[in-house]
Amino acid sequence: RHGSRIMRPVMARMARWDRETADRADRYVAISHYVAGRIGRYYNREASAVYPPVNTEFFRPDQTAPEGFALVVSALVPYKRIEVAIDACAQAKVPLKIAGDGPERATLERHAAGRAEFLGRLSDDAIRTLYRRAAVVLLPGEEDFGIVPLEAQACGRPVVALGRGGARETVR
């Protein structure tokens, strides 16, 4: 309770600073229409959407046949909702490989209880190989943009994503 008494004026001052700073911008550029919409709602300003690029010379299909596993490529943090992919793959009896690392790794490994293979942080070459071998790439969390679906699709692999956020713009 003491913290809220102290934090309330600090948060009010930060909100004022945020508004004043936002009002000084000449133009807003967002990484997706989803983020541009948030800018419009919060700041009552228009924003252009410019998608981050994907290196389609590097991420491209080859002759690799899919191997029947699902793939998650992600930082292992709570908002990515990796546990949803673990549970869904376990229920569907589809092997799951998880590439990435982060503070939630130990928690997710306990949750998975052997139902997923954790690969850790990998090189871009290793990620590309995994995309090409995966039957499907999963994006279970809400992302402002999400580069993973574009890389996977550039490698010729289907993506199943949460139907919110930037994925609605990029998953075809």
Model regions and ranges:
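Nucleotide-activated donor-binding/catalytic signature segment of Leloir-type glycosyltransferases, i.e.
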Residues: 106-125
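Short acidic/histidine- and often glycine-rich active-site loop of Leloir-type glycosyltransferases
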Residues: 151, 164-172
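Acidic anion/phosphate-binding donor-loop and adjacent secondary structure
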Residues: 37, 41, 54-68
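Membrane-proximal helix-turn-helix segments that form the acceptor-binding/catalytic region
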Residues: 2-28, 36
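Acidic donor-binding loop of glycosyltransferase active sites
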Residues: 132-144, 157-158
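Short hydrophobic "strand-cap" motifs at the C-terminus of beta-strands
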Residues: 31, 72-74, 99-100, 119, ...
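Conserved donor-binding/catalytic core segment of Leloir-type glycosyltransferases
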Residues: 29, 62-97
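Active-site donor-sugar recognition loop in glycosyltransferases
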Residues: 126, 140-145, 166
